[in-house]
Amino acid sequence: MDYTIEHVLTRKIAGFHLVGPWEKTVPQGFEQLSLWVDNFHIQPQAWLAVYYDNPQQVAPEKLRADTVVEVPADFTLPENSVGVILTDLPGGQYAVARARVENNDFGTPWLAFFTRLHQDVRYQMAARPCFEIYLNDGKRDGYWDIDMYIPVQTSGE
Protein backbone atom coordinates (compact mmCIF):
# COMPACT_ATOMS: atom_id res chain seq x y z
CA MET A 1 0.00 0.00 0.00
CA ASP A 2 1.39 3.37 -1.02
CA TYR A 3 1.34 6.27 1.41
CA THR A 4 2.74 9.75 1.85
CA ILE A 5 3.97 11.61 4.91
CA GLU A 6 2.11 14.89 5.34
CA HIS A 7 1.98 17.71 7.84
CA VAL A 8 -1.68 18.02 8.82
CA LEU A 9 -3.21 21.08 10.45
CA THR A 10 -5.34 20.87 13.59
CA ARG A 11 -9.02 20.46 12.72
CA LYS A 12 -12.07 21.63 14.70
CA ILE A 13 -14.50 18.71 14.91
CA ALA A 14 -18.02 18.22 16.23
CA GLY A 15 -19.92 14.99 16.74
CA PHE A 16 -20.25 12.02 19.05
CA HIS A 17 -17.80 10.18 21.30
CA LEU A 18 -18.48 6.44 21.42
CA VAL A 19 -17.26 3.49 23.47
CA GLY A 20 -17.72 -0.11 22.38
CA PRO A 21 -17.10 -2.43 19.43
CA TRP A 22 -16.36 -0.23 16.44
CA GLU A 23 -18.38 -2.36 14.01
CA LYS A 24 -21.48 -1.40 16.05
CA THR A 25 -20.71 2.00 17.56
CA VAL A 26 -19.29 3.71 14.47
CA PRO A 27 -22.32 3.03 12.20
CA GLN A 28 -24.67 4.06 15.04
CA GLY A 29 -22.58 7.17 15.63
CA PHE A 30 -22.85 8.18 11.99
CA GLU A 31 -26.63 7.73 12.12
CA GLN A 32 -26.72 10.10 15.13
CA LEU A 33 -24.32 12.48 13.40
CA SER A 34 -26.39 12.57 10.20
CA LEU A 35 -29.52 13.43 12.18
CA TRP A 36 -27.72 16.21 14.05
CA VAL A 37 -26.19 17.63 10.84
CA ASP A 38 -29.59 17.57 9.09
CA ASN A 39 -31.61 18.92 12.04
CA PHE A 40 -29.27 21.85 12.66
CA HIS A 41 -28.36 22.50 8.99
CA ILE A 42 -24.64 22.05 9.68
CA GLN A 43 -22.39 22.53 6.63
CA PRO A 44 -19.58 20.00 7.23
CA GLN A 45 -16.18 20.54 5.68
CA ALA A 46 -15.53 16.78 5.95
CA TRP A 47 -16.90 13.62 7.60
CA LEU A 48 -14.45 11.69 9.80
CA ALA A 49 -14.10 8.77 12.18
CA VAL A 50 -11.41 9.17 14.85
CA TYR A 51 -9.94 6.10 16.53
CA TYR A 52 -8.21 6.31 19.92
CA ASP A 53 -7.26 2.69 20.67
CA ASN A 54 -5.50 -0.32 19.20
CA PRO A 55 -8.10 -3.09 18.79
CA GLN A 56 -5.34 -5.68 19.21
CA GLN A 57 -4.61 -4.31 22.71
CA VAL A 58 -7.99 -3.01 23.95
CA ALA A 59 -11.11 -5.10 24.56
CA PRO A 60 -13.93 -4.41 22.06
CA GLU A 61 -16.28 -3.05 24.73
CA LYS A 62 -13.65 -0.43 25.69
CA LEU A 63 -12.70 0.79 22.19
CA ARG A 64 -13.10 4.56 21.82
CA ALA A 65 -14.00 6.41 18.64
CA ASP A 66 -15.56 9.68 17.52
CA THR A 67 -17.93 10.09 14.57
CA VAL A 68 -17.56 13.74 13.63
CA VAL A 69 -17.68 16.43 11.01
CA GLU A 70 -15.02 19.05 10.47
CA VAL A 71 -16.40 22.52 11.17
CA PRO A 72 -14.95 26.05 10.91
CA ALA A 73 -12.57 27.16 13.66
CA ASP A 74 -15.13 29.67 14.99
CA PHE A 75 -18.00 27.14 15.08
CA THR A 76 -20.20 27.04 18.18
CA LEU A 77 -22.60 24.23 19.03
CA PRO A 78 -26.26 25.05 18.43
CA GLU A 79 -28.52 24.96 21.48
CA ASN A 80 -29.99 21.54 22.23
CA SER A 81 -27.06 19.68 20.66
CA VAL A 82 -27.44 16.95 23.27
CA GLY A 83 -24.42 14.67 23.53
CA VAL A 84 -22.44 16.49 20.84
CA ILE A 85 -18.77 17.20 21.52
CA LEU A 86 -16.79 20.09 20.05
CA THR A 87 -13.04 19.61 20.16
CA ASP A 88 -9.79 19.78 18.19
CA LEU A 89 -8.26 16.90 16.27
CA PRO A 90 -4.51 17.35 16.73
CA GLY A 91 -2.41 18.18 13.74
CA GLY A 92 1.15 17.07 13.11
CA GLN A 93 2.96 14.57 10.95
CA TYR A 94 0.80 11.75 9.55
CA ALA A 95 1.21 8.86 7.16
CA VAL A 96 -1.70 9.11 4.71
CA ALA A 97 -3.07 6.38 2.43
CA ARG A 98 -6.18 6.12 0.27
CA ALA A 99 -8.31 2.98 0.12
CA ARG A 100 -11.61 1.72 -1.24
CA VAL A 101 -13.72 -0.12 1.35
CA GLU A 102 -16.19 -2.70 0.08
CA ASN A 103 -18.68 -4.79 2.07
CA ASN A 104 -18.11 -2.45 5.05
CA ASP A 105 -14.71 -4.11 5.63
CA PHE A 106 -12.81 -1.13 7.03
CA GLY A 107 -10.38 -3.35 8.96
CA THR A 108 -8.59 -4.86 5.96
CA PRO A 109 -7.20 -1.61 4.48
CA TRP A 110 -6.25 -0.35 7.95
CA LEU A 111 -4.34 -3.57 8.70
CA ALA A 112 -2.58 -3.39 5.32
CA PHE A 113 -1.63 0.24 6.02
CA PHE A 114 -0.29 -0.52 9.51
CA THR A 115 1.66 -3.52 8.17
CA ARG A 116 3.24 -1.42 5.42
CA LEU A 117 4.05 1.46 7.78
CA HIS A 118 5.70 -0.87 10.34
CA GLN A 119 8.12 -1.93 7.58
CA ASP A 120 9.36 1.66 7.21
CA VAL A 121 12.23 2.10 9.67
CA ARG A 122 12.21 5.89 9.19
CA TYR A 123 8.95 6.39 11.13
CA GLN A 124 7.20 5.15 14.22
CA MET A 125 3.68 5.78 15.45
CA ALA A 126 3.12 8.92 17.51
CA ALA A 127 0.77 9.30 20.48
CA ARG A 128 -2.18 10.88 18.65
CA PRO A 129 -5.37 9.31 17.33
CA CYS A 130 -5.72 7.76 13.89
CA PHE A 131 -8.57 8.94 11.71
CA GLU A 132 -10.24 8.46 8.36
CA ILE A 133 -11.87 11.00 6.08
CA TYR A 134 -14.74 9.85 3.88
CA LEU A 135 -14.48 10.97 0.27
CA ASN A 136 -17.92 9.77 -0.85
CA ASP A 137 -21.28 8.54 0.46
CA GLY A 138 -20.78 4.80 0.75
CA LYS A 139 -24.43 4.15 1.55
CA ARG A 140 -25.35 5.64 -1.83
CA ASP A 141 -22.38 4.35 -3.85
CA GLY A 142 -22.06 0.85 -2.36
CA TYR A 143 -18.41 1.38 -1.37
CA TRP A 144 -16.42 3.91 0.65
CA ASP A 145 -13.36 5.78 -0.59
CA ILE A 146 -11.38 6.92 2.43
CA ASP A 147 -8.13 8.65 3.32
CA MET A 148 -6.55 6.99 6.36
CA TYR A 149 -4.28 8.99 8.68
CA ILE A 150 -1.78 7.41 11.09
CA PRO A 151 0.20 9.79 13.33
CA VAL A 152 3.94 9.32 12.96
CA GLN A 153 7.22 10.73 14.12
CA THR A 154 10.74 10.19 12.89
CA SER A 155 12.22 7.04 14.45
CA GLY A 156 14.32 7.81 17.49
CA GLU A 157 12.36 10.93 18.50
From Swiss-Prot:
InterPro entries: AraC_E-bd, DNA_gyrase_inhibitor, DNA_gyrase_inhibitor_GyrI, GyrI-like, Reg_factor_effector_dom_sf. Keywords: Cytoplasm, Stress response. Its main location: cytoplasm. It is found in: Cytoplasm. GO terms for cellular component: cytoplasm. Pfam families: GyrI-like. One of its GO terms (molecular function) is DNA topoisomerase type II (double strand cut, ATP-hydrolyzing) inhibitor activity. The keyword Cytoplasm applies. It comes from the Bacteria. Belongs to the DNA gyrase inhibitor family. Inhibits the supercoiling activity of DNA gyrase. Acts by inhibiting DNA gyrase at an early step, prior to (or at the step of) binding of DNA by the gyrase. It protects cells against toxins that target DNA gyrase, by inhibiting activity of these toxins and reducing the formation of lethal double-strand breaks in the cell. Interacts with DNA gyrase. This is DNA gyrase inhibitor. It comes from Cronobacter sakazakii (strain ATCC BAA-894) (Enterobacter sakazakii).
